[in-house]
Amino acid sequence: MMAALYPSTDLSGVSSSSLPSSPSSSSPNEVMALKDVREVKEENTLNEKLFLLACDKGDYYMVKKILEENSSGDLNINCVDVLGRNAVTITIENESLDILQLLLDYGCQSADALLVAIDSEVVGAVDILLNHRPKRSSRPTIVKLMERIQNPEYSTTMDVAPVILAAHRNNYEILTMLLKQDVSLPKPHAVGCECTLCSAKNKKDSLRHSRFRLDIYRCLASPALIMLTEEDPILRAFELSADLKELSLVEVEFRNDYEELARQCKMFAKDLLAQARNSRELEVILNHTSSDEPLDKRGLLEERMNLSRLKLAIKYNQKEFVSQSNCQQFLNTVWFGQMSGYRRKPTCKKIMTVLTVGIFWPVLSLCYLIAPKSQFGRIIHTPFMKFIIHGASYFTFLLLLNLYSLVYNEDKKNTMGPALERIDYLLILWIIGMIWSDIKRLWYEGLEDFLEESRNQLSFVMNSLYLATFALKVVAHNKFHDFADRKDWDAFHPTLVAEGLFAFANVLSYLRLFFMYTTSSILGPLQISMGQMLQDFGKFLGMFLLVLFSFTIGLTQLYDKGYTSKEQKDCVGIFCEQQSNDTFHSFIGTCFALFWYIFSLAHVAIFVTRFSYGEELQSFVGAVIVGTYNVVVVIVLTKLLVAMLHKSFQLIANHEDKEWKFARAKLWLSYFDDKCTLPPPFNIIPSPKTICYMISSLSKWICSHTSKGKVKRQNSLKEWRNLKQKRDENYQKVMCCLVHRYLTSMRQKMQSTDQATVENLNELRQDLSKFRNEIRDLLGFRTSKYAMFYPRN
């Protein structure tokens, strides 16, 4: 029987001496008895073994013959092999679809057959199984399928529902078949949900509950499922990536899994955008507004470019989507507008253009103020020209700050309340203009979006300091009219406080130029790296301050006890020769000494320990504390900071192009709208365009209360709805094209991989096996059903 089951094995040349001896012929210390401790199932009969072997070899005629001869029912058609696979499972794994149909017709059952077919991605088997299942009166839900599949009597090996498994495999064809069965998916609850269902599941099995949530999100993040079930796949990918990123911060045990799913959603949105073939499709995608977003009715009627989808991508931090080549090309076109020829000019002409606009920016601003709708005004309205004009205005403001320090009057140095100079009034005009610009951005963007930008935060702090400076100067001028030496002034005199705030505001004003580096492909990545390093330094600061505070408390408590006079403080503990050493007798002094010691700015003699007879123990403890501080901070924490900064820089350098393009897009978007066209201080002057808008809005409001006005308003709303519906239809048409191209590109990638080659080999093997069995059956080579066990020589 052994030779029959394993015909390729030759045991004739194996001597009995080479085989291991039985345990009975050897001592117990020389052999180890092996015993199967697992559940032993009933041994299959010879017919059952033949039945399973025929299914494995894909012999359709032999399987059919065995099933036809099983009229008495002696053969268990649901028998399993040593691996726990029944005939249906074996047939699915071998992709023998004709045998699968035959087995199902004869009533072979398998609880996890559909799961095996989905896991093996055998589309034909899934189609056969779904069509063979009896129709039910009620719609099956995923919860019911889960309960049925996870029933212990089925002994299934997969703890997942069919549609979830198909989504995990990202198989578009199988998902299409399953969704036609009217299945549903349970909506995942939040991590901290305290509803009755979540509390019961979490109490019963918290691991299963967390794993089920992860499986659901794996299903929802499947690109194939998103394309099939969502009308707006890009928006759904944005929302899912944000939810998954939030989940990765809450469920830290599965952080890597959730981060990988979030990355998958981002890459899907990027790849879908990459399928756009012309500017018209890009314009439809990037300007699409979802139903939940606020609409600009005037911009919609005037067919203005709002780029709402691109703004949403920046809000959701979709760096891959924004930095995609098609998106960047479209942004470049919008950025230069009517000055598209600027990019093709030589470098010298580019510099001359920028310098000319930078010098004559007041004249250009006045021209736009007078005639904003003219051809010249439209050129100024392009984002690139707005950027140059706003930059020139800010450089003029910095020049005024430098002039302010140069024209400082020494005669008024001791004046307690000096009057404002002419240059002060010019600075106030600029500051009011910058504040008005920030107020308009705050109004249109909202507080949350406004504060997300570090550039807006810096501008807010800077303008607040300037306002406080000039307010204190006005207070000092109205309250103080005397002259006195500065050393006699109060420490918090309004003039002194104003000068301090003004100095700090000047520092921030120049640091604000860093954000202009974002437009440069050379300086931009460096500016982004510096921002990331500052964030990492903030994390390091929390650890460093704790260590500094700990050692400061210890040294202060050690050296400030029992000493009240300077004579007693001389030469005590850690010693400083020839000068009074009271460094560690106060909290502030100890903190300063330990801080500056990191930069080698503290005198070395401070940390020399003097051992005397009376203070030997105290001096030794102080030396140990300072030595430990030296090791922990100077050696360990400082090197840790260097490693953190190097890691941050390397992380930005590895994704330099993506990070820079994303930061540049954020800067460019702030110049795309028509809310802040004029720079400070011209933006505080009411323009004719603003006056016309106000008059038009007022007249519309007045006319809306008349009968003709109401009819006109209804017609306008109807026109707006029709235009919105037309835009939505165009978006759906473009999205269908993108999905079709995406599926085609994915299919081409699959055909070029090794996996596709293996599938082709499997198909070829099945065809050859089928052909062999048909030839044998026709020629009558198989005279007995046991010929598979006893092949002819």
UniProtKB/Swiss-Prot annotation:
- A GO molecular-function term, please? store-operated calcium channel activity
Topological domains annotated Cytoplasmic: 1-345, 380-386, 440-455, 518-536, 645-793
Q: Where is this region: Disordered?
A: 1-30
Q: How does it sit in the membrane?
A: Multi-pass membrane protein
Repeats (ANK): which ranges? 46-75, 83-109, 111-156, 158-180
An example GO CC term for this entry is: membrane raft
Where it sits in the cell: the answer is: Cell membrane
Record comment: activity regulation = May be operated by a phosphatidylinositol second messenger system activated by receptor tyrosine kinases or G-protein coupled receptors. Also activated by intracellular calcium store depletion.
Q: Cystine bridges: which residues?
A: 571-576
- Kindly state which keywords UniProt assigns to this record, in alphabetical order: ANK repeat, Calcium, Calcium channel, Calcium transport, Cell membrane, Disulfide bond, Ion channel, Ion transport, Membrane, Metal-binding, Phosphoprotein, Repeat, Transmembrane, Transmembrane helix, Transport, Zinc
Extracellular-side stretches of the chain, per the record, are: 405-422, 476-496, 559-623
Q: Which NCBIfam families match?
A: trp (TIGR00870)
What the record says about family reads: Belongs to the transient receptor (TC 1.A.4) family. STrpC subfamily. TRPC1 sub-subfamily.
Could you identify this protein by its name? Short transient receptor potential channel 1
